[in-house]
Amino acid sequence: MTASGFDLTPPTDDERRRLEADLSPEEADVLLHHGTEAPFCGGLLGQKDDGVYGCRLCGLPLFRHKTKFESGTGWPSFWAPYDETHVKAVRDTSYGMVRVETRCARCDSHQGHVFPDGPPPSGQRYCINSVSLEFTPTGTPLPDPLGRGDNEASGEHDQRG
């Protein structure tokens, strides 16, 4: 369990197959094959409501609305994760660049990249694909596609959102 009350145990093979079967082709390309959606096209880019952004594949909360900011890059950007342990950093040397890829710590799905050019207080910019995320408005139970019972972890979704 994380400090915020979520189980990071990876999905079983059967659970993973079930979750992957529910993805659109674009979601599968980004989440499973490390693709990138076109800039300025993502459905969550202009989302300004209070709530939580969770992993589209497994439902783990990854970012809060209050850490989202307008970066001008064309992808939703956040200056901090929901819980540091929910987002995993992996060195990415694809396309002749050295970057830090961000993945969901529970299901290992690709989310985007993190760069050291964000606003205070962290100085980080988590640049995330909209199709990698699922938005849950404050006051609505978080998704629990794995049936772990942690979708109301600590019962603080309204306060944490």
Give the positions of each predicted feature.
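Accessory (non-J-domain) regions of J-domain/Hsp40 co-chaperones
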Residues: 1-6
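A short Gly-Trp-Pro
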Residues: 7-161
